[in-house]
């Protein structure tokens, strides 16, 4: 059975303003994340992503961390977390991200010009976070080998008119307070 698909169909929906938001272990940490679901997702990422010559996995805090940690453990590729806190370290790069329900600054450390990176995140919805991350990595001069989001919420996003392509594991929409699977295989 496809645990990711079923877990999304079972996900509760809440409203944040005009935004219908599904609550899911991958995107929210609640309900609890079962090891089998995480394992299934990691295997799918490893099969879908281009990992050849990747130097670093890069993920925004906070909900990309558990996924990226598991992928790092399975591939022996080091992990860089883009933090919401500034540390003032040499080479730190700031970015501003805006989503459908929040905005703020984030900070990248330990990514340098010429680094070959895999960008991982939990959800691609408005594209605000992913666009800000990819633009910052371009500014640094990193080579983004591949970009993967676990779940894509259907609809327009900020990456639609950009040169950036994001692979996904599953695409969904929310209709009448329920998650609907749009593409159970996601985007390649």
UniProtKB/Swiss-Prot annotation:
Question: What is the protein's given name?
Answer: HGPRTase-like protein 1
Q: Which NCBIfam families match?
A: HPT_Archaea, PRK02304.1-4
What is this organism's lineage? Archaea, Methanobacteriati, Methanobacteriota, Stenosarchaea group, Halobacteria
The reply on keyword Transferase is yes
Q: What is a biological process (GO) this protein takes part in?
A: purine ribonucleoside salvage
User: Has UniProt tagged this entry with the keyword Ligase?
Assistant: no
Membrane-crossing ranges are none
EC number(s) given by UniProt:
2.4.2.-
Q: Provide the species name.
A: Haloferax volcanii (strain ATCC 29605 / DSM 3757 / JCM 8879 / NBRC 14742 / NCIMB 2012 / VKM B-1768 / DS2)
GO MF, one example:
transferase activity
Task: Give all cystine bridges in this chain.
Answer: none
Under the heading InterPro entries, the entry gives: HGPRTase-like, PRibTrfase_dom, PRTase-like, Pur/Pyrimidine_PRTase
* Name of one Pfam family that matches: Pribosyltran
What this chain does, per the record? Answer: May catalyze a purine salvage reaction, the substrate is unknown.
Query: What UniProt keywords apply to this chain's record, in alphabetical order?
Result: Purine salvage, Transferase
Identify its protein family.
Belongs to the purine/pyrimidine phosphoribosyltransferase family. Archaeal HPRT subfamily.
């Amino acid at each position: 059975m496809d645990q990711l698909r079923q877990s999304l169909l079972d996900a509760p929906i809440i409203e944040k303003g005009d935004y219908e938001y599904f609550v899911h272990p991958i995107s929210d940490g609640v309900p609890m994340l079962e090891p089998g679901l995480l394992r299934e997702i990691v295997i799918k990422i490893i099969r879908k992503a281009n990992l050849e010559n990747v130097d670093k996995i890069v993920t925004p805090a906070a909900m990309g961390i558990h996924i990226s940690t598991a992928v790092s453990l399975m591939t022996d590729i080091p992990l860089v977390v883009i933090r919401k806190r500034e540390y003032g370290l040499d080479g730190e790069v700031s970015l501003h991200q805006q989503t459908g329900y929040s905005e703020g600054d984030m900070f990248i450390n330990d990514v340098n010009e010429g680094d070959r990176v895999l960008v991982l995140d939990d959800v691609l919805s408005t594209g605000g976070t992913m666009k800000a991350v990819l633009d910052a990595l371009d500014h640094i001069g990193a080579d983004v080998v591949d970009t993967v989001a676990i779940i894509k919420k259907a609809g327009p996003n900020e990456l639609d008119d950009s040169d950036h392509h994001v692979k996904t594991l599953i695409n969904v929409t929310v209709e009448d307070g329920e998650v609907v699977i749009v593409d159970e295989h996601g985007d390649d």
